[in-house]
Regions:
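Generic structural detector for well-ordered beta-strands
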Residues: 54, 74-76, 128-130
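N-terminal secretory signal peptides that target proteins for export/translocation
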Residues: 1-3
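Anionic N-terminal interaction surfaces
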Residues: 19-59
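Short polybasic amphipathic segments
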Residues: 34-36, 60-64, 113-117
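Mid-length scaffold segments of soluble, non-membrane domains
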Residues: 58-89
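Bacterial N-terminal signal peptides
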Residues: 6-15
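Short acidic, glycine-rich loop/turn motifs
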Residues: 42-43, 66-68, 117-121
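Acidic, Ser/Thr- and proline-rich intrinsically disordered linker/docking segments
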Residues: 21-28, 79-157
Length: 157
């Protein structure tokens, strides 16, 4: 009986350390994100690209991969200057007109993550990602932990 307990203790300790090593080199991926790709000569219109936002702790890169597994951007942690999280709130006018005027009292909330960085040429760039409301807090926490940069928060009420 003691041999069984010793065996279980060894298995538990080995599995604990094995799990710790796996999580340290793991890629944190967040589905249902939209990269707002700036298009046009004036760079004022954005085309949303649906995909997955990932923080790779092994290569120290933030990357966005679209639904076809084509990388949209890749940013090194060292190149990141600042990270901004925004939560916007807008009234639901269409639902108020079509369904009930009480929808004016409820607001739709959208979550955005903006990363400012310098590219290889040394010029300042930025990317904006529309986050899913289900994992927005996790993305902000992961961005802060992975990059070591403080995430600025701007929230409308």
């Amino acid at each position: 009986m003691r041999l069984l307990w010793k065996f279980l203790a060894v298995v538990l300790v080995v599995s604990f350390f094995a799990n710790g090593q796996e999580s340290a080199g793991k890629v944190s991926k967040f589905d249902d994100a939209e990269y707002l790709h700036l298009t046009g000569a004036d760079k004022k219109t954005a085309t949303p690209i649906r995909g997955t936002l990932g923080f790779n702790n092994e290569t120290k890169i933030v990357e966005f991969v679209d639904k076809k597994n084509v990388p949209a951007f890749s940013i090194k942690y060292d190149a990141i200057k600042s990270i901004l999280y925004e939560r916007t709130s807008t009234p639901r006018y269409v639902a108020a007109l079509l369904v009930s005027p009480f929808f004016l009292f409820s607001h739709s909330k959208k979550h955005y993550l903006t990363i400012q960085y310098t590219d290889d040429a040394g010029t300042g760039q930025f990317v904006s990602i529309h986050l899913d409301k289900k994992n927005a807090r996790d993305v902000v926490a992961t961005a802060e932990a992975a990059t070591g940069k403080k995430v600025e928060r701007e929230e409308e009420k």
